[in-house]
Amino acid sequence: MTSRLKTTILCVDDHWSGLISRKMLLESNGYQVLVATGGDEGLRLLLSHSVDAVVLDYQMPGMNGDVVAVKMKRAKSHVPIVLLSAYGPLPQSKLDAVDTFLSKSHPPKILLSTLQDLLNRRPRPFFSRWFNTWRSRNEGARQ
């Protein structure tokens, strides 16, 4: 299980009320939260901070969430992205760069469990390197 201590979630939404309610939800569940009110600001924060996951609104002025997600994945492909929309299901072409799509009408616990699942699935670079080194050294001993 991923420790929420120092786990940073970036929330991007042009509606301040939704942004603040998600920030409060995530902080009350132990996450550190960065907020951005648009795609360009979200990209800047992603590039300048250590972000563990992104919660991204779909419909925003200037650049929709699907376009922002593509740019974010190009910059940091390992960071999971949850795309939110109040407008129901989106075509698959809009979801190619995101890890999960959720309707904004889902209960908050669904967002929390989705984030936890995504964070638990992430590769852990140090552990993976250590384990692969250990395994390669010990495979010869077992044969």
Predicted regions and their residues:
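CheY-like receiver
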Residues: 122-143
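Active-site residues of response regulator receiver
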Residues: 13, 57
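Helix N-cap/capping motif at the beta->alpha junctions
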Residues: 35-44, 65
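Short amphipathic alpha-helix used as the core "switch/output" element in two-component signaling
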Residues: 44, 66-77
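Receiver (REC) domain active-site loop signature in two-component systems and cognate sites
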Residues: 60
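Two-component/phosphorelay signaling modules centered on CheY-like receiver
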Residues: 16-34
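Active-site beta3 strand of CheY-like receiver
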Residues: 49-55
